[in-house]
């Protein structure tokens, strides 16, 4: 019998690329850590406003951050919840990391005004690529499930109005900024994406 094609992305914090990066500690120099300001001597509370597959949130939590994940798509939220529990049961080390992760279901534009954090990260569905190879299967399946994020400008505005000291937007390296986005404080560039960093005074 032919194998049925998957219609949902795999969310896995134990095996695959996430597990390898964790076991090999390959993420210690990741640009996201620089963008958020996280370091071994500086623990932060980070809100991941677009949790998706949870990979960035897990990386941050594995490096000591306390992370609140917000996911508005019910199917993706359910996949994340299941993966978090599977990782929690895998080992004490993973359980300690998962213990620093809190998953919320809802629209970040609504939830952010009710929350406080040191950093808010935003990694929306990026504009479709037109001159590159097909995106990896997991991201393609995620895009098929959640669709586009036309409201990224509204989400960025909500984050910049929230009680936090820094907002980090992950965006394609050479893509134009989202509509109405103001100039970031600085940028950290990777090979295919950049992190637009907005450093701002706390409201309290």
UniProtKB/Swiss-Prot annotation:
GO MF entries: rRNA (guanine-N2-)-methyltransferase activity
EC primary class: transferase
Record field: catalytic activity: guanosine(1516) in 16S rRNA + S-adenosyl-L-methionine = N(2)-methylguanosine(1516) in 16S rRNA + S-adenosyl-L-homocysteine + H(+)
Binding site residues for S-adenosyl-L-methionine: 55-56, 71-72, 123
Superkingdom classification of source: Bacteria
InterPro entries in UniProt: 16SrRNA_methylTrfase_J (IPR007536), SAM-dependent_MTases_sf (IPR029063)
Location of the protein in the cell: Cytoplasm
GO cellular component, one term: cytoplasm
EC number: 2.1.1.242
HAMAP family linked to this entry: 16SrRNA_methyltr_J (MF_01523)
Similarity field: Belongs to the methyltransferase superfamily. RsmJ family.
Function: Specifically methylates the guanosine in position 1516 of 16S rRNA.
Protein name: Ribosomal RNA small subunit methyltransferase J
Gene name tied to this protein: rsmJ
